Amino acid sequence: MLLLIHCLQSAAKLNLTLRVTGKRGDGYHELRSLFYELPSIESLTIEPDYGHNVKDTIFVTGETIRGRNILEDVLATARKKMDVFPLRIRLHKVVPPGSGLGAGSGNAAALISWLNTARDENEKLGGEEAGSDVPFFLKAGKWAFVGGRGERVEPLVEPMPRFFSVVVVPSWGMSTARAFSLLSAKYGSSFPMDEEDAEKERLLVLEKLKDNLTYGLLPNDFFTVLLKEHPEYEDLF
């Protein structure tokens, strides 16, 4: 039997701005952000498992994932809309979970894109169910304005600056739920910036980057709460 092995690249991202402007009725927070996609630095190898297995097998190398893998959630959601053989997936992780770079969402988006190949529109997955950052990886190019809880993606297709970055990842990580819990404890329902000002701010950051101008410390509402939890964070700045 011929087995087709599919090798997929998986990206991560940077939040060049990240403002939380309120809490929604569905429990999620309202965001305004400028996203930049980092080069593909992780990979998935996928092959159908036509043997006796009735479950998927996911092998992870590189970094350790504790708890449920987001790829399991993608496959569970996919099978509600489409037929999917049991799969054998090898995921090579480079970015530690809880780093805020969205690498797990990048993994999910890579798998969703593969699952959506040659599917009818009514079968395709949108990505919102898997995670708030997933729509960006599915809909955008390198740059995008992102709003809502992450589902509203406005790709920026005009000529964009060449962007080089040095990404420093600390030895500790923090779950998204924990980070938002700390933020809510600090601000309650009154966050530092409203939606209009957050949109103006991200546009200003983008314009300065396009003009090769220095902006300074990029705005991120999580900075102060993370600094309180991990004072060594300040050494980076």
Question: Which positions does each model-derived feature cover?
Answer:
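ATP-binding N-lobe of GHMP and related small-molecule kinases
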Residues: 2-99, 116-120, 158-160, 169-172
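Gly/Ser/Thr-rich beta-alpha loop segments that engage phosphate groups in nucleotides
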Residues: 24, 29, 100-108, 149-150
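Short amphipathic alpha-helical segments and helix-helix/interface helices
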Residues: 32-35, 124-127, 237
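Residues at the starts of beta-strands that form the adenosine-phosphate
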Residues: 43, 124, 164
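Conserved, helical-rich catalytic subdomain that frames metal- and/or nucleotide-binding sites
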Residues: 55-56, 139-140, 144-237
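Charged catalytic carboxylate motif
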Residues: 70, 107, 232
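DPxDG-like acidic metal-binding loop motif
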Residues: 99-124, 128, 136-140
